[in-house]
């Protein structure tokens, strides 16, 4: 788990040049101050985490349990509640604001997000299969996955077989990304 974390929104992408005149692709994030709503500890909750919110939301547009949760903590209601699993939460208090400067000091970050959904994809796109021959008798099977299992024994396809299906729209993490600039 992490020592520090923060929630942000992807705005877009751009590029910058480094000292050797190499182009670096850069993802631009909007990171609003995150307000701590609840501190979850190992002793009380069984795991350590921070529950944070960001942005603003009218209390009239919330359910009563949500509004009560914010009222009990004394924190202004935000757009979403997000839980950040951390190793040590002793240094955090309810109502504390987390800003991007705390994360930017480290220089490197791990980014977790939901990947782009690509819908139902074939085996070649989804798993990088090579496909079948383009000629020499191949008939309408050029992008097919090929054989998927054995014959009478075991009379089934083993679990985990790479086949066509939904691609993307899954939680994914990229490790050790460089922080280029934070303001």
List each model region and its residues.
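Extended basic (Lys/Arg/His-rich) segments that typically form rRNA-contacting surfaces
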Residues: 1-183
């Amino acid at each position: 788990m992490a020592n520090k974390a923060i929630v942000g929104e992807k705005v877009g992408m751009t590029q910058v040049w480094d000292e050797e005149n190499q182009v670096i692709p850069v993802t631009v994030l909007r990171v609003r101050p995150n307000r701590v709503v609840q501190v979850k500890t190992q002793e009380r909750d069984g795991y350590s985490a921070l529950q944070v919110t960001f942005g603003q939301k009218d209390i009239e547009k919330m359910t009563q349990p949500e509004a009560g949760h914010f009222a009990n903590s004394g924190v202004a209601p935000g757009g979403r509640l997000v839980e950040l699993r951390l190793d040590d939460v002793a240094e955090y208090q309810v109502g504390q604001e987390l800003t991007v400067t705390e994360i930017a000091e480290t220089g490197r970050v791990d980014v977790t997000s939901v990947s782009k959904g690509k819908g139902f994809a074939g085996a070649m796109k989804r798993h990088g299969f090579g496909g079948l021959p383009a000629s020499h008798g191949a008939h309408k099977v050029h992008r097919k996955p090929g054989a998927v299992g054995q014959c009478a024994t075991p009379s089934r396809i083993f679990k985990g077989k790479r086949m066509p299906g939904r691609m993307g729209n899954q939680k994914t993490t990229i490790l050790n990304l460089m922080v280029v600039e934070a303001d």
